[in-house]
Amino acid sequence: MDSHRGRTHRIPVLLAVILALTSAACSDDGQQTSSGDTRTAASPSLRPDQQIPELAVEVLVDDLTNPWDLAQAADGTVVFDQRDGGLSAYLPDGTVRDIEADFGDLYANSETGLMGLVLDPGFADNRRFFTCQGYAGGEGDIRVISWEMADDYAAATRLTDPLVAGLPLTSGRHGGCRLRFDTDGALRIGTGDAAAGSNPQDLTSLGGKTLRVDPDTGQPWPDNPFVEDAGANPLIYTYGHRNVQGLALRPGTEEMYSAEHGPDVDDEVNLLIAGANFGWNPVGADPGDYNESVPMTDPNIDDAQPAIWSSGEPAIATSGATFLDGPEWGGYDGLLLVGLLAGQGILALQLDEDGALLSASRLPGFDGTYGRIRTVQLGNDGLLYVTTSNNGGDVLLRVTPQL
């Protein structure tokens, strides 16, 4: 991999007012909401009375292969991983450093490998961080592991291995696995259903769920919704998911949002509510069947929670998610961004204060420019960091707003 600090592409403001999201799910001038009506989005601006920034896109690192997740430390270092194994650090001086770490037990196949990564909120002092990976030992599963990072980012050693185990693994399809912290300090884990039909609705399975765990012990967070239910795994926070790819905490709130893949239709963004069932139920006629023709939110489930946004047809493969936050983003401040794999761009959602969808559009300058977008993440410096997922020739990008 190579560092390319200083290669910058500026995206004109003019593009911001013409790139509305269009898809087969809605008419050419509208966007489907969760209730099925359409609302035109002429611009991804949350605050139209404020200036729309130009976006300066800089390639920080290239020659990567499927970088999956990233996190920025308080010192400005960006830590990132690659799905087939390996951790790296982009240092503030532009140096890229490989982090020595043991991934000898990594299972990497299909959609599963080394996936989610998040720094502990106290990373500056405790140097702790967390990853999620396929595990090749025993019968195989997906596991969350805690690590300690060396002060110079040269090496990382395992602390709690595993912190959480038993996330289902089959062929490598639908492995999840995104990690983020909430405002209480709990570790949230978004999982995939492992393409097994019974998993999403089975409260004894960790597949097709979001989990909420104590990052010190891996035990359930004390007020999890199923801690008193003997028939459920107490780690579970929500269920009825297909393949959670993104988690995003809305600044200034306790609201956590997920982005997940639909089959060939209906990718979703959801506002996570404790104990809620999000309605994915792909059971077939025979045991072991995986029926992907069913709707993402099954109307036969009375309490199924509707998505706040759905792609309709075709699916565009929603992935990592983050909120823009800060005056430097001008009219973009407050937008929920979602990376698009098949859609090859960045979705920009405008939400009201209750989390309801107001409009959907595309962030300018990314449609097909960099291929498949895996992760979008706001850094501690207020800038946007992006990874691509093109099975080679991938990049780590930094996006700077310019008012």
Regions found by a protein language model. Give the residues of each.
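Blade-loop segments of beta-propeller domains
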Residues: 96-121
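Beta-propeller domain segments
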Residues: 37-50, 81, 112-114, 122-124, ...
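Bacterial signal peptide processing site
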Residues: 27-29
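C-terminal motif of bacterial Sec signal peptides marking the signal peptidase cleavage site
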Residues: 21-25
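Beta-strand-rich domains and repeat architectures in extracellular enzymes and scaffolds
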Residues: 59-85, 316-323
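Asp-box/WD-like beta-propeller blade repeats and closely related beta-sheet repeat scaffolds
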Residues: 141-180
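Surface loop/turn motifs at the tips and blade-to-blade linkers of beta-strand repeat domains
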Residues: 59-65, 100-109, 163-170, 228, ...
